[in-house]
Amino acid sequence: MAAEEADVDIEGDVVAAAGAQPGSGENTASVLQKDHYLDSSWRTENGLIPWTLDNTISEENRAVIEKMLLEEEYYLSKKSQPEKVWLDQKEDDKKYMKSLQKTAKIMVHSPTKPASYSVKWTIEEKELFEQGLAKFGRRWTKISKLIGSRTVLQVKSYARQYFKNKVKCGLDKETPNQKTGHNLQVKNEDKGTKAWTPSCLRGRADPNLNAVKIEKLSDDEEVDITDEVDELSSQTPQKNSSSDLLLDFPNSKMHETNQGEFITSDSQEALFSKSSRGCLQNEKQDETLSSSEITLWTEKQSNGDKKSIELNDQKFNELIKNCNKHDGRGIIVDARQLPSPEPCEIQKNLNDNEMLFHSCQMVEESHEEEELKPPEQEIEIDRNIIQEEEKQAIPEFFEGRQAKTPERYLKIRNYILDQWEICKPKYLNKTSVRPGLKNCGDVNCIGRIHTYLELIGAINFGCEQAVYNRPQTVDKVRIRDRKDAVEAYQLAQRLQSMRTRRRRVRDPWGNWCDAKDLEGQTFEHLSAEELAKRREEEKGRPVKSLKVPRPTKSSFDPFQLIPCNFFSEEKQEPFQVKVASEALLIMDLHAHVSMAEVIGLLGGRYSEVDKVVEVCAAEPCNSLSTGLQCEMDPVSQTQASETLAVRGFSVIGWYHSHPAFDPNPSLRDIDTQAKYQSYFSRGGAKFIGMIVSPYNRNNPLPYSQITCLVISEEISPDGSYRLPYKFEVQQMLEEPQWGLVFEKTRWIIEKYRLSHSSVPMDKIFRRDSDLTCLQKLLECMRKTLSKVTNCFMAEEFLTEIENLFLSNYKSNQENGVTEENCTKELLM
């Protein structure tokens, strides 16, 4: 008996018992079993390998050599990986290993989401969970606080299995006899061995890690390997709906095959939770397999105590078939993977013929959508009353929170209803109601209330954009009693499901993807030999040269200018654009002083009723500019936005200059404008772009050219960009704020007069003209002011602007600052 006893560490490795004698056949040489180590040609008759007789090899080198040979044998011969061989191990090391084996606890978890708690759920925790479920519903945070010893993720994971088991069993209560009838009890009368073997077992083990990976477990399921036999045995017949899977192997030997099946022997006792008993619910209650109906097959080899259990009973096979039909997330075993007297041959066949893509078979939770019938008529809601259905659907406002009160819920709900009355029958999106609900809660909270009102038909009734299908969680238990309660419960679940992120699965190549992306695909499963043969055939084939024209450097030019399209009767302007004289003056001033592109923000307002965008102010910004492109400095952009907000304006657009070429957007400008439009449209706002060209060589007039544009959804014929459309701009008949324009002019002059791209304002701006750059600027400003004020005030203001420029640029010339390069650019 002493020679047969062996200790199993948490990796499944076999260590000779401390009581074994050196001459009893349990020496180190006997551990090298013939079927689990190298081919016979690699060793001598007595089983020893020649290199093991060399005493000069250190223990470290010996271990490295063993590992290399094991890996070579595993990958080349496709045999099962053997147990780790412990050579010349000291007795104190063995005792230390034995102590670790008896106290070790492992948690089996999904490799993508490691759980942080390995203790099984106690009866008290389960009772507290049920109390919290009855009191708080599916509020996992509150239930976690009630339990105290479990995190929110652990409570959620336990609840998933709890509801799943209730759905499988069909009844909330089940007698202990019914529960124990789902387990198969295997007894060895000679040694008193008992093993409760669940009919749904399939495991995978990694020999290099102290964790046993179980396929088809949920993310937070746990497996404990412990020696607490009495405690587990006492709790087995009691209520046990936990998702924890507990394995107990005290002082036993465990062989594990390459595919992950466990072959146990000696005195071992394995207890499993009832998470796997759901696949036996179709069996009769009194159908219990006795120990006489199951034969225990034991094989003893001369050099070791290797035992296997063969389950040959016909009823057991039928139960296995029933389990294979089960589609839950339990642990599933195939009948073809049961242990047999020749485990290595079975492993080889499985290696050659089977490729498991559990993730492709929808191991992850399915995200099916449950259709909700669209409301038949629009619902009128009393603005002063909160119905019970609203409290069930949006419970966060009725839990006594300081920030989320029923009064705040009324404010949000009634504001959304008011906005719907204004924009009816146009679709009311979530972002359009956010500006009027500042300091009323986060975006998701407002979105959930909007979704609830849309689902019940209070808003967006009859709109095509209204969506009545929401992703639904899998583990939801349906309430069948009251129809109204069912509808409210389902609605609440849809709203809660919006908080959870979409689960992903792995494709056959190991890449993360959406589960729906794998639907309708067929994968070809090839063995290693077939795959290698196909690769050799592909190498032998001549490579066909694809005659694809090489793209030239100019095939895609981000600075290519795209002419704007014009709105017509077929495609009308989405809104009108009106620009104040103050904004035109500042844009002209800013664009004239630099031969590099300048940039800034436009502030104003948008009237939804009149469909008019009013550009009231222009705020210059610092630019991160090169000779070819211009981007807005983030810090300066933030400051400009705050300046416009102080004046009561919203950011409704941006402007930049094309100093000496046409005011048409480049491909880069189109991309930038499209991104701005997409961002601001989420809140229901409008966003325009303006381009100022002061020194365009193709423009015979001294006035600047200005283009106001938006980017449409239409795609160009070659599919490389979206089409820009140009607005007809109207000037607003309001006098500018003279002092503000003068201060902006002073800031612009101080910033650009010493820059390398500064324009010499006293030089001729073009060869065929007598006007200097400053005189040209004054002509542009005079034209703008002629429509909003009398000529005397305009001339007085222009004189002050001219004196400001002359004083600054005269001092520059005295300091020796020349602008020859910019002059050449202007004259060209």
Swiss-Prot record:
Biased amino acid composition, Acidic residues: 1-12
A Pfam family of this chain: SWIRM
Keyword Translocase: no
Inducing factors: By DNA from viral infection and intracellular DNA.
PROSITE patterns on file: MPN, SANT, SWIRM
GO biological process: chromatin remodeling; immune system process; pigmentation; positive regulation of transcription by RNA polymerase II; proteolysis; regulation of cell migration; regulation of hair follicle development; regulation of hemopoiesis
EC number(s) reported in the record: 3.4.19.-
Residues carrying Phosphothreonine: 236
Annotated MPN domain residues: 577-709
Protein residues bound to Zn(2+): 656, 658, 669
SMART domains attached to this UniProt entry: JAB_MPN, SANT
SUPFAM superfamilies for the chain: Homeodomain-like (SSF46689), JAB1/MPN domain (SSF102712)
Record domain SWIRM: where: 372-470
Sequence motif LXXLL motif, residues: 774-778
One GO CC term on file: nucleus
PANTHER family named in the record: EUKARYOTIC TRANSLATION INITIATION FACTOR 3 -RELATED
Clinical note on disease: Bone marrow failure syndrome 4: A form of bone marrow failure syndrome, a heterogeneous group of life-threatening disorders characterized by hematopoietic defects in association with a range of variable extra-hematopoietic manifestations. BMFS4 is characterized by early-onset anemia, leukopenia, decreased B cells, and developmental aberrations including facial dysmorphism, mild skeletal anomalies, and neurodevelopmental delay. BMFS4 inheritance is autosomal recessive.
Subunit structure: Component of a large chromatin remodeling complex, at least composed of MYSM1, PCAF, RBM10 and KIF11/TRIP5. Binds histones. Interacts with NFIL3; this interaction is critical for their correct recruitment to the ID2 locus during natural killer cell maturation.
Entry remark concerning the domains of this protein: Contains an N-terminal SANT domain that mediates histone/DNA binding, a central SWIRM domain to mediate interaction with chromatin associated proteins, and a C-terminal MPN domain that contains the metalloprotease activity.
The protein's role, per its UniProt record: Metalloprotease with deubiquitinase activity that plays important regulator roles in hematopoietic stem cell function, blood cell production and immune response. Participates in the normal programming of B-cell responses to antigen after the maturation process. Within the cytoplasm, plays critical roles in the repression of innate immunity and autoimmunity. Removes 'Lys-63'-linked polyubiquitins from TRAF3 and TRAF6 complexes. Attenuates NOD2-mediated inflammation and tissue injury by promoting 'Lys-63'-linked deubiquitination of RIPK2 component.
Name of the protein described by the UniProt record: Deubiquitinase MYSM1
Organism: Homo sapiens (Human)
